[in-house]
């Protein structure tokens, strides 16, 4: 499949982030955000989505990880949107249910051009490594609104918070992979409006 590559660089008073993405890759990653647990989750997303991802981030982690996590979501969303280009022949929708031992998560995506997010998580700890668990939703919101997609993410059940979050990121990768997959039968874009 033809490569779909985009690069985004963003610098603010709080973070400096550069990213390169290939939506039709092999799941190769080089990710360094300064937040090891986030790096792990992004690696899982990329690997299971077969997305090649390079991402380097420096942020004001001495304050906390909020700015870095949110801004990584912003940059990845912008990169994703740019890499999609005209969206011709993509399937548009993707859904994945992923089990991780006792946990089960689902993610459904619509590459609609209409940003919207619904998350249903009930994490029972405040932090995993350096990552506040509440920032999982902040990351997804930033990604969603900058990519221009609708995203529904849910942990159906689970006990281990690491497993729950890991299942969400793997499901995100798989849902993205399904949604960006091209079907030669789709002439133009998958919309009766003619645009996405």
From Swiss-Prot:
* Cell compartment(s), UniProt: Cytoplasm
Keyword Cytoplasm in annotation: yes
Question: Which EC class is this protein assigned?
Answer: lyase
| Keywords of this entry | Amino-acid biosynthesis, Cytoplasm, Histidine biosynthesis, Lyase
What reaction gets catalysed by this protein?
A: D-erythro-1-(imidazol-4-yl)glycerol 3-phosphate = 3-(imidazol-4-yl)-2-oxopropyl phosphate + H2O
Q: Which GO terms describe its cellular component?
A: cytoplasm
Pathway(s) per entry:
Amino-acid biosynthesis; L-histidine biosynthesis; L-histidine from 5-phospho-alpha-D-ribose 1-diphosphate: step 6/9
Q: Which family does it belong to?
A: Belongs to the imidazoleglycerol-phosphate dehydratase family.
- Its protein name is Imidazoleglycerol-phosphate dehydratase
Instruction: Supply the source organism for this entry.
Output: Clostridium botulinum (strain 657 / Type Ba4)
**What gene makes this protein?**
hisB
